[in-house]
Amino acid sequence: PAPRGTPQIEVTFEVDANGILNVKAEDKGTGKSEKITITNDKGRLSQEEIERMVREAEEFAEEDKKVKERIDARNGLETYVYNMKNQINDKDKLADKLESDEKEKIETAVKEALEWLDDNQSAEKEDYEEKLKEVEAVCNPIITAVYQRSGGASGGSSSSEEDGHDEL
């Protein structure tokens, strides 16, 4: 209870799902009430702004896809080139199995590809793919020949051993 002469006012606050605030004040003594609704439009996006942003996202989706494809193509080329570089220098891989002229051809192709990558930072997807084909055209036949030689050598020795067993 408030001292005599002090009005008793009941204030009710309600916030709905849209963030709209409804305030109701009622004077208990007179029964008179007032109501006000407060909306906070500042900082909120209008429907037009939302639609514009969706349109822009759709417009840029195609461009983003092209950029991703370009980056993937560049990464594919870089990965192949660095794998070749590692294989020809790693004794556990191809370093000991390559002839000097084969190693030189691969080293030259790798060096040229790395220089090309440095000089063509913003090349198109097709350019990266074309360069990858060029490097593969040099490296793959050599790698295939090395594997055939090493596979053929072990196959030859096993057939010799079998022949040896037949002779015994």
Curated annotation (Swiss-Prot):
Q: Which residues are glycosylated?
A: 120
Q: Name one GO cellular component term.
A: endoplasmic reticulum lumen
Molecular function as annotated in GO: ATP binding; ATP-dependent protein folding chaperone
Any idea which UniProt keywords this protein has?
ATP-binding, Endoplasmic reticulum, Glycoprotein, Nucleotide-binding
Query: Per the record, which residues fall in region Disordered?
Result: 148-168
Motif (Prevents secretion from ER) positions are 165-168
Which PANTHER family is this protein grouped with? HEAT SHOCK PROTEIN 70KDA
Q: Which family does it belong to?
A: Belongs to the heat shock protein 70 family.
Quote the protein name from its UniProt record.
Luminal-binding protein 3
